[in-house]
Amino acid sequence: MKWHNIGRAVLTGLVGVGLALGASAQTLTSNATGTHDGFYYSFWKDSGDASFGLKAGGRYTSHWTKSTNNWVGGKGWETGSIDRVVHYSGTFGVDDSQNSYLALYGWTRNPLIEYYVIESYGSYNPANCEGGTDYGSFQSDGATYNVRRCQRVQQPSIDGTQTFYQYFSVRTPKKGFGAISGTITFANHVKFWASKGLKLGTPDYQVLATEGYQSRGSSDITVSEDAASANAGK
């Protein structure tokens, strides 16, 4: 997968779509965004049989086969926070031969920035964009994260077709497959990015996303945040 497919996938599903659902478990097979049991969610696919299950609280499930060209979905927060400490656990049902990733994903405005904290990926590292700039690495949550900036020129965004930057923090070593869990102290990423001149703007949504591109797999992920970071956002 080329790195730009990830952004295009999420954007197409998130812009201009709204759907509020109750707290009962549901399985989505059509593109939608909204809130469910206290969490924001997004689901988009361009074809095929990918499905997205809304479960209690911050839990979601997904399943897809190669009949789906590209899909992405996740649960999180309608308004992102630079101070959010995100916890996730569950299963990431892919392997090194499958083109998929698991990441904290979000947007800001003024400046318009698309960002990723990549926790695990399969056959393709989403930060491997052509013409990108590397900004070194830093330590957070028991791992090293490599930082890279990519530019999108006149491509879809939360504000329509725009030119904007993407920031990537890619975990090394990446998390494995199967049972998976971790913590993302997002403030550490924001601080390092800022030290390199990579500024964020006003937060838009922020989700813990699963993505698949011309691959097959499944996920069952529960996302939550520290109480302190939740209160800070109020």
PLM feature spans:
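Bacterial N-terminal signal peptides that target proteins for export
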Residues: 1-11
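An exposed acidic His-Trp-rich patch
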Residues: 110-175
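N-terminal signal peptide c-region/cleavage motif recognized by signal peptidases
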Residues: 20-22
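Beta-sandwich interaction modules
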Residues: 75-79, 151-200
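Extracellular-facing segments of soluble proteins and assemblies that are Gly/Ser/Thr-biased and enriched
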Residues: 73-139
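Bacterial N-terminal signal peptides
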Residues: 10-18
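N-terminal segment immediately downstream of the Sec signal-peptide cleavage site
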Residues: 26-78
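Long, compositionally biased interface segments
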Residues: 178-234
